[in-house]
Amino acid sequence: MNKNLIIPKDKIADFCERHHIRRLAVFGSALRADFSAQSDVDILVEFQPGSEPGFGFFDMQNELSNLLARNVELHTPNFLSRYFRDAILSEAEVQYVQS
């Protein structure tokens, strides 16, 4: 994880519990040296079985943007391009796992 990105673990855990997320991970430039003040944060979420946020997904993205004080691009494994999915899943750094 890039030192310029601070992930407040307690707030992320609260966010995930409220939104029925079983796993949240960061991927992309936030893990590399090219991450800058202008970079957004790519976040991958997996929901608990039977939990689908619908249009609330965009509200969640905005909430995470406010929480991290950066633009957030929220993704789910099924929305990732099949051409990049395996690479993203293998590089992603998990920040929350439902206990």
Role assignments for model-derived ranges:
Residues 1-25, 31-37, 48-99:
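Catalytic core of pol beta-like nucleotidyltransferases
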Residues 44-46:
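Short hydrophobic/aromatic beta-strand micro-patches
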Residues 28, 42:
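Conserved G/P- and acidic residue-centered "switch" motifs that form tight phosphate/ATP-binding loops
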